Amino acid sequence: MISLVFGDALARSFPFGSRTRNVNDLGNQFVPYHAHLWDMLHGEADGDVLVNWQSGYGSSFLPDLGTYLTSPFAVLVGLFPRDEIDLAVYVISVLKIATAGAVMAWLLRTVRTGPWWVAGALGASYALCGWTLATAVYNPMWLDGLIALPLLCLVGEWALARRRTITGALLVAVAWMANFYTAYMATIGAALFVIARLVIDRPAHVVTAVSGPPRGSTRTAANAERETAAEHPATEPATAADDAGPDDVGSDRGTPTVGLAGSPASAPRPSVPRLLGELWRPLVTLLLGVGLAAPLVSVIYAGTGEAYPGRDTEFVAEPWQDVFARLLPGGYGYNSPSLYVDTVALLLALTLPFNTAVPRRVRYGWSALVVAVLLSFQWKPTHLAWHAFTTPNGSQFRQTFVLCALLVIAAWLSLAYARPTWRALLGGGGVLAALTLTARDSQLLYAWSVPIMLAGAATLALALALWRFADARRRPVLVVLAAVLLVGMQVGQSAATLAVSDRKRLAHMDDYAPWGERQREQRAAIQAVDGWPAYRTEPGRQQTVGNDPMMVGGQGAQYYSSLTSDVLSRTMTALGGGWTSGGRSVQSLDNPVTDVIFSVGARLYSPPDPHQRWNPRHPGPVVTVRQKVPPLVTVRPPGPRPAYGISAYRNQELLLGARVYDVPSYTLHLTDRPQLPRTRDGGYRVPARHRAADPTAQVKAVCRPGSSVFLWAPRYWGKADLRDGRGPQADFRGDYPPKRSAAMQELGRTPANGQVRITLTALRGGSVPKGAIGCLDRGKLKAAADRLTDRGATEVSVDGATVRATVRAGSRGTAVVAMPNIKGWECAAGGSARPATSYLGLVSVPLDGKATTVSCTFQPPGLRGGAAAAGLALLGLVSIGAWRAWRARQTGRAPAGHPSTSAASHD
């Protein structure tokens, strides 16, 4: 924790300075989701655990809850004032990192006994690894995987010891529910750990259980384990004699060898296949735990199937010089594996192959495992296996914390058997020097990375010398000095590495302001006019983050999630909406037609966010505009179901049920060029304007005087303003190929002469499609809205995940609920419920003229199957508990010394 605080203070990062922490997903997703959780805990949210009514005009929330908010630490957000939401997320992140270090220290002491302060220091090395400092610190949900890995390794240890099956299964369930994505990677890492323990370390209790007690002995595996534990508490006994090399036998540096029955040859050594046969025990524990987590995991899995596909990414291996550079302090790279563990831990790990006090099988086996895992990062098939067979967008080495854990375990093994000699230190130092030499030309290193690494190596050598001298002279104060040196170097290196990461992230990632006066003003304005479910209140087009409705309130179209539904993204795109992040960050659409369609009765207009450097500086108050709109449930007349076309204007009219736009033909040319290249759909390609002297593009069209002029140009990046239209200059940010899409925007009113003249200042260029200009007749729109109101529901109520509406008697046609038809909605109109039908992407219910009520209830896909799996897992755990209770009673009745006497608690 000291390293984290010190590093953030060095970088002058929140909460210790003026620099924001909220980069990328931390600002866009994690802080807003925690704000929504705060609202839920305090009864102020619109929705429940199944439906979030504030985002995406109604989105499935349980998959988001499982993805972002089911960590046991997340509920701590409710203890903070809502205005301190950023501080709450920061404190939660720090607590997660500290917990990960503590659990790793526990695991190390379980693997083998050793000084508690060294275990604590190496636990901190793991918790403050490069993956944490460079990647996970702004993805707080991934920090649960940092805790899960050593926790699952402990569960594996218990399973091999035939202990704590129920506790282990419950901890597996907690880990998988906290964040299943990193728990999946942690499970792979824990599986490698358990296999290594069986094949390399061969724990005494497992060997005894597989081989049986020595001939003539009446001891059971459980008794052997208890006797061994009494001699060597909190660890497995050493087995160095079995595998000692010529220089190991008789050495006084290692822990004395204790056989399974008190002598080295008390039992025959089992074969590797027989040892691996014991894997069924941790496997059963894992399956029971994942089964308990199935209701959440299955919902998330189903949600990914319904999500907008986003962008395809191809895996590219990183240059080895950059990979090795990330082992050193101060290295930073967005898409390279963050392998840093402080130099103390790294050098100790590198001494393992050279530490002759460690049995050959242990030092070579664990070293080979570390190398194999590192190689798996750079090979596409194993890369895909690590990432659930999908190359992620963004960082492609999200499993790096597993390798950091293995490095720390290797460091512990090298020190726990016996402190490395000078020969081992020189061997490890030689490997470190070779790695540093390979990485010398990497652009990911700071100038001081190598000097601070050398300082760390020198500190370790000095601390080990002091420690050895203290043991020889019996001066414990020198041990304290050695500990202070080691821990001080760790704190300094990790703090410096974090400070570098904090600053470099801000240089190449989008960043967002923490909660401040802007959000307070918006939230107060929304609370003053909020009328849900009679109408929606839109937080507005000028967004602060990608999830403004969850941050400041209201019920908008804006929604950013890894699980943004395909139907929402495609529906809003068809209506002229904009998005970023490959379609998964849907933006608000400021349009009077869609406001009528989605029952938006109040809309906020805020000045551009001053935190973003590209925004114009137009300070001013937050303005709320009210309008009368149809209810949430409206009725369309009988007829064939319409289908969307190419034009966003015509698509809006289809959903509205009335013609309200004129879509004139137009011409577009540069001031010095009469002709521009055309697109295949009949539009124009607009070249980028690189200099102020470059020509602008002019658009000419004719519209009805007084009509509202809109421009729909999803692939255009630049500015647009309507001459004599008295409207503001509009910014468009659309890419091609489409990583983002620009939203349709209003430019102003058509002048009295009907001549529409639009100036395009192309910053990056792009294209303008055929039918890009729409001229809205507001009188026709009002008439259409009145008709929808007259035919719409007379009463609408929303209770959690259920919408109920009363429609007029004799209503025929289709009841349309103004929310996206995400999979899971079931509706009824006077009859039994059945899956909702789709009306241009919205939930709809057929009306036959007899029904007067319509009700729709949401149940996330995958919940039923997950609940069934959880029921079976729970039945399995209850059966195990009952069987243990029966065995305990039977054991209590058995005569003393009878062979059936065994520890039931170990079965």
Placement of each model-derived feature along the sequence:
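Contiguous transmembrane helix-bundle modules in multi-pass membrane proteins
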Residues: A368, A372-V373, T390, Q396-W515, ...
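Membrane-embedded helix bundles of polyisoprenyl
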Residues: I97-V111, W116-D201, E278-I300
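Active-site-proximal, structured, solvent-exposed surfaces of multi-pass membrane proteins
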Residues: F30, R680-D907
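Perimembrane helix-loop-helix junctions
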Residues: W158, A186-L286, L460-A465
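Periplasmic/ER-lumenal interhelical loops and adjacent helix-loop junctions
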Residues: Q29, P213, E278-G365, A372-V373, ...
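Membrane-interfacial loop-to-transmembrane alpha-helix junctions, especially the N-terminal start
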Residues: G114-A121, E157-W158, R163-G168, E278, ...
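Extracytoplasmic/lumenal acceptor-recognition loop(s) of multi-pass membrane glycoenzymes
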Residues: G492-R505, Q527-D595, P637-Y649, P728-F732, ...
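Membrane-interface coil-to-helix junctions
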Residues: S3-M104, A124, C129-I147, A317-R326, ...
